[in-house]
């Protein structure tokens, strides 16, 4: 059917940096043998998951905490960071920038983040 094993893995993964009410719905929608990656809780509340879903879906629920992982696996962390920078350089990964503030407006930029109004990256411009 033309897809590689690697692309099939990506189709069975859910990356959740938001948490909250939609986490359980997303986990209910996961494919058989899928992986649900818990990245963070940007929405505020920490989701409560019925663990029987992992059993019924044959799925894995994996916590991904960058700080601990990079401290425990520094070589792998550096390799991942280098790969990410290459993807940005090659325009294969383009971060979504939704807010740009002048440096002197830094308080407004931080307020945008703290009040959860930012939908993408918030940039402080020195120009």
Outline where the language-model segments fall.
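Single conserved hydrophobic/aromatic residue that forms the stacking wall/gate
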Residues: 1-10
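N-terminal Rossmann-like NAD(P) cofactor-binding module of classical short-chain dehydrogenase/reductase
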Residues: 12-15
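Short beta->alpha linker loops
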Residues: 17-18, 101-105
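An acidic, carboxylate-rich microenvironment
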Residues: 53, 105-108
């Amino acid at each position: 059917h033309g897809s590689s094993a690697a692309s099939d893995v990506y189709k069975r993964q859910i990356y959740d940096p938001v948490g909250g009410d939609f986490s359980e719905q997303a986990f209910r929608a996961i494919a058989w043998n899928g992986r649900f990656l818990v990245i963070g809780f940007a929405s505020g509340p920490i989701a409560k998951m019925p663990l029987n879903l992992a059993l019924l879906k044959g799925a894995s629920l994996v916590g991904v905490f960058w700080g601990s992982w990079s401290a425990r696996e520094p070589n792998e962390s550096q390799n991942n960071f280098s790969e990410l920078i290459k993807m940005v350089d090659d325009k294969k990964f383009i971060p979504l920038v939704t807010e740009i503030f002048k440096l002197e407006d830094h308080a407004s930029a931080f307020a945008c983040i703290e009040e959860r109004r930012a939908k993408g990256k918030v940039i402080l411009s020195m120009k």
